[in-house]
Amino acid sequence: ETALRAKIENTLCLEYPADKLEILVASDGSTDATDDIVREFEPRGVRLFRQEGRVGKTETHNNAVARANGEIVLFSDATTEYEPDVLRKLLPAFADESVGCVAGRLIYVDKASSNVGKGARSYWNYETFIKSAESKACSLIGASGCLYAVRKAAYQPMYAEACSDFLVCTMLYRQGLRSVFEPSAVCFEDTNHRPSDEMRMRVRVISQTYTDLWRNIDMMNPLQSGFFAVELISHKVLRYAVPLLLFALLISNILLARESVVFSIILAAQVFFYLLALAGWVLERIGVRLKFLVIPLYFVLANLASVIA
């Protein structure tokens, strides 16, 4: 509830003409004070859309977009803080009629200085690099859910199980529209600092993405979707296949260890790396944070999430 108040105040401070800005807060059957908080801001132009029945984020998005009046719909999360100029940075890209979505740059803030938070920031810096390259080469295959804008006329309702900020780029590409990355449009969000919270979040997102990839498997055919297919395969499919490759590497290494000292050393290095990750997990739970455990912990956490999903 505190985050929601701060989010609405932050949105009201955006540098954009008030008469051209509609702020719509979607509440998915909230049972706390969410709706009452939003109503407090109604005199300042904030609208409440209450979705009955707890249908989930994606269905709520679908129904909220149908009630929005603008030509461009900007999606956000209640926990995200925008820079005041995000709209002025995002919107010019829509002057290109081939652009259907513009995604901004998310910067994670690790207030707790946790190893999980540091790992998430490192991972996201790499993810941001990939997004920038995809945008220049062809099109984004996924946006950051806390900061992306879409042409309302091109938005299509999605099934409830979808990871909406990922699937939207595929749906737009089917219509011949690109999704681009605008790094100067910036938002901030706190990282998770507990391994269990980060694991839960990653499992949820990855399981939804698996569903989206399966339902859009035709888009992974380069003959149909060109370089977009290459991006989907390299960015998502191969990434989620890493645990299988790591398992195969470990098993083959075990079988070959007796044949060569080199293989024995490599096996020992693998086991040591996984032990470091385990130590990082245990120590993080009791509040002990060692910097050299950041990479092993988050690498194993992210790949374990792919397996669980």
For each predicted feature, which ranges?
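A conserved acidic beta->alpha catalytic loop
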Residues: C13, P17, S27-D36, G53, ...
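Hydrophobic targeting segments
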Residues: L4, I8-L14, L21-A26, N303
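Acidic helix N-cap motif at the loop->helix transition within catalytic regions
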Residues: T2-A6, K20, T31-E40, D85
